[in-house]
Amino acid sequence: ADVALLMDGNKADMLLTDPPYNVDYIGKASELETKKIENDKMEDSAFQDFLTSAFSNAEENMKAGGVFYIWHAEIEGLNFRAACKKAGFQVRQCLIWNKNSMVMGRQDYQWKHEPCLYGWKDGASHLWASDRKQTTVLDFDKPQKNNLHPTMKPIKLFDYQIKNNTKGDDIVLDLFGGSGTTIMAAEQNGRRGFVMEYDPKFVDVIVDRWEQFTGMKAKKIKE
């Protein structure tokens, strides 16, 4: 119902989203105190149900042929793929974001990449607006600062994905707004960003970021 309210009868041309990874990530103490991510520590079956519900809502509000990009954690790949299948999304490829530096952790091999599931809704052909030289490895630098959100993505990365599969004033949907990278990338390409975020702290981050970028004032339509 919330997604239908957001869309108001519109259908999305793309889903570009970065859901919680279910890894109980908490940012460093030196970063903003808002660094805890909601719904990031759930039992296996509950997490898959959570994702399935979100993806099903997205699928219902997308055009046939609409492309999806779903970022996720490698260790939760099975749950993400299973949720996609249950929601009616057919994963066609898995893209890899190759970062310019690793992320320090406690595991034997330090993480230097993040995967992204790519595909499109059945029922129509999808739009591919780029050339035939693009590969499944995406080389983009990490944001220099992660002070807005612990898993913040660079605008250039989402800008690249939006350019590859949308045109004009197409609608880009994101059900996990986070730091607002999707709406920022949509804005600078003239696309219409339809974004949801559960945590009020990050809603404020998104609004502030958009206002600074556009020089405009956000309007609250209703409580």
Q: Where are each of the predicted segments found?
A:
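Short mixed-charge
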Residues: 215-223
